[in-house]
């Protein structure tokens, strides 16, 4: 445990260094975006509008990668530059600075950005959990295999405070009548480090996303709770208000292409496995067997989910601004 806590503290000391790296990243990204825009010039010599859209190498973003590879964005008449980030923090900074006009992510970030006077709205839900597919779980390390959930919660769960991870942990524990006040959060913001600490018994338990949940199970960890069924883990497509207002046709075309890609994934799961493995960073041991996610029809984010996350943010005093559903969700753009 002491080794695990030392590793977590070392990670916290890296924060200032990470901020410097993000500043460098934004400088590089600015050059990259400009170069890509010039490539989109039409035959008349005038630059075609480009939607710079931020995403992460995760399973829920698969339709974005499929739409790009299958040419669906082009078919819909929209030029899209998918800007890939390795962390949500990098993506959020890029959105805040205007380097990207839209992004893929959880329900929480748009609310935090909007509360900090960066006008962003969610236009569609691209993925949600069902009874047959999970996306997040709390797992116990092999050394805690004989301990009960209450004991493990108090011993400590590796995760990240004030993030969607903590929200999911709180809601999953509440489903077992365990109040969030009992949770001993061990701060480990890096997901790969969290996985490593779990598998090396440096922490009693950890919160992880798929496909790392399945990988951890293969290596001896035990799933205590997961989000299959409750529909807690919606991921959304969000845009800056300025872009929504000035380029509504581009947003609709983008969402139409994503909807087409989602349907293609559902009809042809074997055909997209190679794209998933490559773009969503599926670990090698799982590349032939991990189930291809099933994607729902694009819908507006469910008001119950949006408001539950918002209330949690208010309770935690992460968001201190009062907002309505209409200030967080943009209607009228779905295909």
Question: What are the residue ranges of the model-derived segments?
Answer:
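Ligand-binding clefts/hinges and TM-proximal coupling segments of bilobed small-molecule sensing domains
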Residues: 32-35, 159-178, 257-287, 326-329
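Conserved C-terminal helix/tail region of periplasmic/extracytoplasmic solute-binding proteins
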Residues: 314-335
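Short, low-complexity disordered leader/linker segments with a strong preference
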Residues: 1-48
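Secondary-structure end/capping motifs
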Residues: 245-320
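Soluble non-cytosolic domains of exported or imported proteins
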Residues: 58, 85-89, 104, 159, ...
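Short, glycine-/small- and polar/acidic-enriched structural segments
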Residues: 41-179, 185-188, 204-208, 222-223, ...
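Pocket-lining segment of extracytoplasmic ligand-binding domains
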Residues: 108, 185, 192-278
């Amino acid at each position: 445990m002491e080794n695990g806590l030392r590793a977590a503290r070392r990670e916290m000391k890296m924060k200032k260094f990470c901020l410097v790296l993000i500043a460098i990243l934004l400088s590089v990204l600015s050059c990259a975006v400009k170069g890509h825009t010039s490539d989109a010039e039409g035959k008349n010599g005038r630059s075609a509008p480009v939607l710079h859209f931020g995403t992460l190498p995760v399973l829920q973003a698969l339709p974005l990668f499929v739409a790009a590879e299958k040419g669906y964005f082009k078919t819909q008449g929209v030029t899209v530059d998918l800007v890939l980030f390795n962390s949500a923090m990098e993506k959020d900074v890029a959105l805040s600075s205007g380097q990207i006009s839209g992004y893929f992510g959880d329900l929480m970030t748009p609310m935090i950005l909007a509360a900090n006077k960066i006008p962003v709205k969610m236009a569609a839900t691209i993925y949600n959990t069902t009874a047959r597919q999970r996306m997040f779980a709390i797992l116990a390390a092999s050394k805690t295999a004989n301990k009960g959930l209450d004991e493990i919660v108090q011993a400590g769960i590796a995760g990240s405070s004030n993030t969607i991870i903590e929200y999911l942990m709180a809601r999953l524990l509440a489903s077992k009548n365990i109040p969030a006040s009992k949770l001993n959060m061990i701060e480990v913001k890096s997901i790969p480090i969290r996985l490593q600490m779990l598998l090396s018994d440096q922490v009693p338990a950890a919160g992880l996303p798929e496909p790392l949940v399945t990988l951890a199970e293969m290596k001896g960890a035990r799933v205590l709770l997961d989000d299959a069924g409750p529909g807690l883990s919606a991921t959304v497509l969000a845009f800056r208000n300025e872009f929504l207002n000035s380029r509504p046709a581009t947003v609709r075309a983008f969402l139409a292409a994503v909807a087409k890609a989602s349907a293609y994934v559902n009809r042809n799961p074997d055909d997209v496995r190679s794209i998933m493995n490559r773009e969503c960073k599926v670990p090698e041991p799982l590349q032939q067997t991990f189930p291809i996610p099933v994607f729902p029809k694009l819908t507006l984010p469910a008001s119950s989910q949006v408001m539950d996350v918002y209330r949690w943010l208010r309770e935690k005093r992460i968001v201190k601004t009062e907002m309505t559903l209409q200030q967080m969700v943009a209607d009228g753009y779905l295909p």
